[in-house]
């Protein structure tokens, strides 16, 4: 499961993310954050952290450096 989720995030980085203008308000990008969270915490907790990050990434959300805990 973890590998599949990482593969999806990598596919996003290599596909649509390269064509679309940068829109992530955080550093590292949301897809990189998801990969790091999944590698560090596994599919369940890492997936939860990635989902929470994606929900925070909007025009009225925060911004700046936000590392994986």
UniProtKB/Swiss-Prot annotation:
Superkingdom: Bacteria
A GO CC annotation given for this chain: plasma membrane
Keyword Membrane set for record: yes
Membrane topology reported for the UniProt record: Peripheral membrane protein
Cellular compartments annotated: Cell inner membrane
Alphabetical UniProt keywords: Cell inner membrane, Cell membrane, Membrane
InterPro entries, per the entry: Membr_insert_effic_factor_YidD (IPR002696)
Family indicated by similarity: Belongs to the UPF0161 family.
NCBIfam families linked to this entry: membrane protein insertion efficiency factor YidD
Function: Could be involved in insertion of integral membrane proteins into the membrane.
Name assigned to this protein: Putative membrane protein insertion efficiency factor
Species: Novosphingobium aromaticivorans (strain ATCC 700278 / DSM 12444 / CCUG 56034 / CIP 105152 / NBRC 16084 / F199)
Organism ancestry: Bacteria, Pseudomonadati, Pseudomonadota, Alphaproteobacteria, Sphingomonadales
